[in-house]
């Protein structure tokens, strides 16, 4: 019998990696119904889909993860078979080794097979995060595509291609109902909307022009979000000698538009993302604290403070009185 794991073993040194490397022995018998998806922060973020088949895990690397709807196919690169023990593997593969980087289980569960040939695989996944009918089909060599055959999950909305930022009204006086606003610094930086999907970033300025290449350092933020899709509003600000993306609003979160949600709720979801990295952070906000925030802005030489009504929706492209800019 051919050793299905020969290629797998040849690529790994048991003295250097904690990955399971079983001896060449008879393969365990299973029911060909186990799947696992592992998020793999290697040189390039991707998700490894592994399907139990004939005692091994037949594997594909999917750079953008599973497609959420039938309208989009994603690349799936057929890789070497992995041992069944790999279904439980999580950890750090040493840099310099094959697949070096952090890996963890994104989802696992059962699957049923509708069709399995050398060029096409139709399956139904039943996991905690991944469910539905998918087909994998070969296009050329190791390159396959994965297509979702079922409709998207109820309530899912596609990520927009762009969002033109909402703009504040400049005022000299503090609003009488200042306690109904969340107050934050106006940084005087470059306004930028970040669209993140499948660990990939598209960055646009206030006019909608793409500026991703000019700010490639921010791609690490997109990778830090993993499979979560999001649209963020913020500013690129020079802090500590380097540009930093300061996130101040969340407009779309993992298949759901938040434009109609009140700012207070959007803000809570933004904080839930815990965006904090070497070149990105969440802008602090202080509900009702306008005078203290304005005084601090003046002391730090910032141009002003921005107030957002806690009950206000996000109005793309509009100059709205629901947002107030007060000069320092």
Predicted features along the sequence, with ranges:
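Catalytic cores of nucleic-acid ligases and guanylyltransferases
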Residues: 1-328
